[in-house]
C-alpha cells in the first residue's frame, strides 16, 4: 500500500461534510441562500410540483373553480349551534308529521313518474332521436326536482344516467311480460306503478307481473294478505325465494356427490327416459296433426288462465318456470318463445333470482346500482327468454333517510349519522326481541319516564357494543361500529319486520314472539357493565348515595412506610399492621411497589 499523499487534492467527501456539519466560528454565506429574504408569493409559481392540466371536473369542482375565478370567498358561519340529544327520537317524525307526509304522498303520487321514450318513426334520424330523448329526460328531472323543492317531499335517490333508462326502454319494448321483482318485507316501496302504466302505453297487449322475492321471510297468512291486495289491484303476483332455492340446489348437489356409486344407475335411467320421450313425441305429433284439422275459434279478448287469482303459496324453481311459461297467451314479440323482462331495484335479489332459475351463475350479483351495464338475454328454456335489465333505482316516496337505510337503498357502510336509523329500528323491533336476539340487557327507562317506551339508539348500542367487545380507545363501547352490525342484521332479515298492505292494520299483520329468556335486572350485572350502559346517565338514588356517602380525607402514600407496625389499606389510609412481637421482615418484599392506576382505579371509572 502506497504512502498517503498529504499534498494531493482535497477529499471531496470530507469537504462536503465539513461544510455541512463543521462547527466553525465564521461560515461563508453564499449568494444563493435564503438568508435575509422573504417569500412574498406575489407572483405565479410556475415551478411548483402540483401543477396539473384539468380537462374534466365534477360539478362541485366546477362550481368552486368558477367562484374562485369570480373572486368569491366562502367563510364558515359557526352560529346557531343545535345540540342533538341522543336520548330522544332524533331524526324521526312525530305522528302528526307522518300523517301530513302520507297525505302529501297520496296527493302527488300521480306525479311520481319514470322518463318516457319519445315517439319515433322510421324517418326519424339518430341525431333527432337522441336530442328528443335528452330533452324529455331533462324535463323529467326538472319536474321531480320542483316536486321535491315545492312540496318538501323526500324521495329515494333515483337513477340520473340516461343510458340506464335507455336500457329499460329497450327491455320493455322487446318483452312480452315485464316482471317487477320486489322485496317481500316492503313490496310497495319497490313497486313502480308508473312503470306498469308505461308498459301498457308501449303495447296494450303486454303484461305486468310482480315477483315477491324473499317470501320465505313471510308467513302463509302474510302472503295471503298480499295476494288479496294485488288481486284488488288487478296484477298477477307470484311468491318466490331465491336464497331458499339456492340452498336446496346446494343440498341436492351434495346428495348427488354422496351417492356417487349410483351414477351408472342414473345414466341407465336417463337412457330409458330418453327412449320413452321419443315415443311420447311421436304420439304428440299424431295428436297435433289431428288438432290442425279442427277449425280455430276467433276471440278478441285475451284468454285468461284458469287460476287467475293470486296464490299465496311459495313457488319452487320448477313451479315458477312453469308459471312464466303459461302466464302469457297474447301475441309475442318473437313467435318461438315468450320474452320475460326482469326489472328491479338493486339489493332486492334480481340477479340472485335469475341465477337460481338458471341453476348456474349467469349474472353477477352486487348491491351497487350499475353493476349490469347492458341488458342481457338468457334462454331459461327453449320457449322462455329472460331479458335482464340493469338494476334501476326508480323514484319513490319515503319519510326519512332512516327509511332508505333500513330498506337497503342507501349503503350502510357510507352512512354519516347512525342515530336516526337505529332509533327507527328500535321503534319497529320491541325491546325483548332485541334482548333475546343478541343476549343483552338494555338499560331500562329512568324514573319519571314512560316505562313502555322503546329504547333509544344509545341504550341499544351501548349494551350491544359492550357485549361484543366493540370498545373505543378511551374504554367506552363503540356505538358507530355497533350500529353498522345491527343495521346490517335488519337489512339481511335477521331482525325481521314486514310492512303490511294498506288494507290490513300493521299491528295485526306483523306480530312478534313472546320473550324467550328470563328477565335479568341491571343490578345483577357486573359493575363495569352497569357503568358502560349508563354513560352520562344517573338516577336520583345514585345522586343521593354519591352526595351523602362518607368521603374520608387522607394523604396518598406511595411505596413502603418507615413504620413496621403500620400498613396501607386499600383506600390509601394507614391502619395497624401485624403483631409487634411477630417478625416484621417475614412475608414482606422490601422493594414492592403497587401501581397507582390499580390503587386508584375507582377514580378512572366511567
Swiss-Prot record:
The UniProt record lists the keyword Transmembrane: no
Entry superkingdom: Eukaryota
Free-text tissue specificity from the UniProt record: Expressed in larval serotonergic neurons.
One term of GO molecular function: GTP binding
CP-type G domain mapped to chain residues: 165-395
Major enzyme class: hydrolase
CDD domains: HSR1_MMR1 (cd01857)
GO biological process, one term: ribosomal subunit export from nucleus
Keywords, comma-separated and alphabetical: Cytoplasm, Developmental protein, Growth regulation, GTP-binding, Hydrolase, Nucleotide-binding, Phosphoprotein, Protein transport, Transport
Subcellular location as annotated: Cytoplasm
Bias-annotated ranges (Basic residues): 584-600
Region span, Disordered: 1-21, 574-606
Entry GO terms, CC: Cajal body; cytoplasm; cytosol; endoplasmic reticulum
Pfam families: MMR_HSR1
Summary of the function given for this chain in its UniProt record: GTPase required for the nuclear export of the 60S ribosomal subunit. Probably acts by mediating the release of Nmd3 from the 60S ribosomal subunit after export into the cytoplasm. Regulator of body size; acts in serotonergic neurons to regulate insulin signaling and thus exerts global growth control.
Domains as described in the record: In contrast to other GTP-binding proteins, this family is characterized by a circular permutation of the GTPase motifs described by a G4-G1-G3 pattern.
Family, per entry: Belongs to the TRAFAC class YlqF/YawG GTPase family. LSG1 subfamily.
Protein name: Large subunit GTPase 1 homolog
Top-level taxonomy: Eukaryota, Metazoa, Ecdysozoa, Arthropoda, Hexapoda
Gene name of this polypeptide: Ns3
Amino acid at each position: 500500500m502506497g504512502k498517503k499523499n498529504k499534498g494531493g487534492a482535497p477529499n471531496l467527501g470530507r469537504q462536503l461534510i465539513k461544510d455541512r456539519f463543521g462547527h466553525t466560528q465564521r461560515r461563508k454565506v453564499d449568494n444563493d441562500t435564503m438568508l435575509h429574504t422573504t417569500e412574498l408569493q406575489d407572483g405565479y409559481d410556475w415551478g411548483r410540483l402540483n401543477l396539473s392540466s384539468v380537462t374534466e371536473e365534477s360539478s362541485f369542482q366546477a362550481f368552486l373553480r368558477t367562484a374562485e375565478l369570480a373572486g368569491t370567498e366562502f367563510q364558515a358561519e359557526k352560529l346557531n349551534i343545535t345540540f342533538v340529544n341522543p336520548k330522544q327520537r332524533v331524526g324521526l317524525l312525530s305522528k302528526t308529521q307522518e300523517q301530513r307526509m302520507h297525505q302529501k304522498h297520496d296527493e302527488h303520487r300521480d306525479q311520481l313518474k319514470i322518463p318516457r321514450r319519445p315517439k319515433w318513426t322510421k324517418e326519424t334520424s339518430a341525431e333527432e332521436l337522441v336530442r328528443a330523448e335528452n330533452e324529455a329526460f331533462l324535463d323529467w328531472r326538472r319536474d321531480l326536482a320542483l316536486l321535491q323543492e315545492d312540496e318538501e317531499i323526500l324521495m329515494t335517490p333515483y337513477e340520473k344516467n340516461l343510458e340506464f333508462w335507455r336500457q329499460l326502454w329497450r327491455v320493455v319494448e322487446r318483452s312480452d311480460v315485464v316482471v317487477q321483482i320486489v322485496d317481500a318485507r316492503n313490496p310497495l316501496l319497490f313497486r313502480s306503478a308508473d312503470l306498469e302504466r308505461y308498459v301498457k302505453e308501449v303495447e296494450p297487449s303486454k303484461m305486468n307481473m310482480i315477483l315477491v322475492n324473499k317470501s320465505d321471510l313471510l308467513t302463509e297468512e302474510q302472503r295471503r294478505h298480499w295476494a288479496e291486495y294485488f288481486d284488488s289491484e288487478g296484477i298477477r303476483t307470484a311468491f318466490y325465494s331465491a336464497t331458499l332455492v339456492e340452498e336446496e340446489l346446494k343440498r341436492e348437489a351434495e346428495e348427488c356427490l354422496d351417492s356417487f356409486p349410483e351414477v351408472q344407475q342414473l345414466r341407465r335411467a336417463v337412457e330409458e327416459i330418453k327412449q320413452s320421450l321419443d315415443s311420447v313425441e311421436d304420439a304428440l305429433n299424431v295428436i297435433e296433426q289431428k288438432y290442425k284439422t279442427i277449425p280455430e275459434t276467433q276471440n278478441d279478448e285475451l284468454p285468461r288462465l284458469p287460476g287467475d287469482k293470486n296464490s299465496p303459496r311459495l313457488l319452487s324453481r320448477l313451479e315458477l318456470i312453469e308459471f312464466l311459461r303459461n302466464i302469457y297467451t297474447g301475441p309475442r314479440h318473437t313467435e318461438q318463445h315468450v320474452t320475460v323482462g326482469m326489472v328491479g331495484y338493486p339489493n332486492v335479489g334480481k340477479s340472485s333470482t335469475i341465477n337460481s332459475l338458471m341453476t348456474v351463475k349467469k349474472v353477477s350479483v352486487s348491491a351497487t346500482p350499475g353493476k349490469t351495464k347492458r341488458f342481457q338475454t338468457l334462454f331459461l328454456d327453449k320457449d322462455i327468454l329472460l331479458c335482464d335489465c340493469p338494476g334501476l333505482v326508480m323514484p319513490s316516496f319515503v319519510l326519512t333517510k332512516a327509511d332508505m337505510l333500513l330498506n337497503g337503498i342507501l349503503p350502510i357502510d357510507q352512512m354519516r349519522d347512525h342515530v336516526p336509523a337505529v332509533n327507527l329500528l328500535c321503534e319497529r323491533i320491541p325491546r325483548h326481541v332485541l334482548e333475546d336476539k343478541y343476549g343483552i340487557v338494555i338499560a331500562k327507562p329512568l324514573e319519571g319516564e314512560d316505562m313502555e317506551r322503546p329504547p333509544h339508539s344509545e341504550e341499544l348500542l351501548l349494551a350491544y357494543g359492550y357485549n361484543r367487545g366493540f370498545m373505543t380507545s378511551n374504554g367506552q363501547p363503540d356505538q358507530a361500529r355497533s350500529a353498522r352490525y345491527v343495521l346490517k342484521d335488519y337489512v339481511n332479515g335477521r331482525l325481521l319486520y314486514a310492512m303490511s298492505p294498506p288494507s290490513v292494520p300493521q299491528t295485526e299483520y306483523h306480530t312478534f314472539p313472546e320473550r324467550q329468556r328470563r328477565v335479568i335486572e341491571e343490578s345483577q350485572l357486573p359493575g363495569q357493565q352497569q357503568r358502560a350502559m349508563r354513560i352520562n346517565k344517573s338516577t336520583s338514588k345514585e345522586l343521593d348515595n354519591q352526595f351523602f356517602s362518607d368521603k374520608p380525607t387522607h394523604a396518598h402514600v406511595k411505596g413502603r412506610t418507615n413504620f413496621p407496625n403500620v400498613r396501607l389499606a386499600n383506600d390509601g389510609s394507614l391502619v395497624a399492621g401485624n403483631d409487634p412481637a411477630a417478625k416484621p421482615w417475614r412475608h414482606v418484599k422490601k422493594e414492592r411497589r403497587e401501581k397507582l392506576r390499580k390503587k386508584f382505579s375507582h377514580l378512572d371509572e366511567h
